[in-house]
Amino acid sequence: MRDPVETYMNLVPMVVEQTNRGERAYDIFSRLLKERIIFVTGPVEDGMSTLIVAQLLFLEAENPKKEISMYINSPGGVVTSGLAIYDTMQFIRPPVSTLCTGQAASMGSLLLAAGHKDMRFSLPNARIMVHQPSGGFQGQATDIMLHAQEILNLKKRLNEIYVHHTGQTYKAIEDALERDKFLTAEMAREFGIVDKVIEKRPEDPAPAPKAA
């Protein structure tokens, strides 16, 4: 059976551009990276996290002041992998705008909320879901207790991050994350995860008329 990842990569469109040295082909994601657009798609795990962090650091090195756009469509995943992306977003100098397309669940919603203030957006039919971290462990009782305490520590830290970015009280965040909480784009705006729900890309302002 063919590897589904290999199949997917073979389906990624190529973009051909004319340069002074002739034609140059890019896969579509590399071409968009040139425009400072990063995609966070699929489950959040170590491999994907490393690629996102590397792209953020590269774009910072290329221009430490120019905005980076992050498009998010993710069901969430590994907490530590998501926190690696989150910390890098806060660490680098360029402002990072976030936009939810499809869904931003679990760690995906945290990354959506982590965008630069007034630069966090959602498309109208996107869905956002927040909840507390989960984990399953087996082994000796002492080890299970240690892992359970670590989950509680992570839960507290994630709550604090949501408080910081949403403006909600700690109690409100704790109550919201107690179970899976599904939000429409407008509800996510009211909750403070995004700043604006957008249907169309804003048009460029018309140039000022020239003086006679």
Curated annotation (Swiss-Prot):
One of its GO terms (biological process) is protein quality control for misfolded or incompletely synthesized proteins. One of its GO terms (cellular component) is endopeptidase Clp complex. Its main location: cytoplasm. GO terms for molecular function: ATP-dependent peptidase activity; ATPase binding; serine-type endopeptidase activity. The active site is at 106 (nucleophile), 131. It is found in: Cytoplasm. It is an enzyme of class 3 (hydrolase). Keywords: Cytoplasm, Hydrolase, Protease, Serine protease. The keyword Hydrolase applies. Belongs to the peptidase S14 family. Fourteen ClpP subunits assemble into 2 heptameric rings which stack back to back to give a disk-like structure with a central cavity, resembling the structure of eukaryotic proteasomes. Cleaves peptides in various proteins in a process that requires ATP hydrolysis. Has a chymotrypsin-like activity. Plays a major role in the degradation of misfolded proteins. PANTHER family: ATP-DEPENDENT CLP PROTEASE PROTEOLYTIC SUBUNIT. This is ATP-dependent Clp protease proteolytic subunit. It comes from Rhodopseudomonas palustris (strain TIE-1).
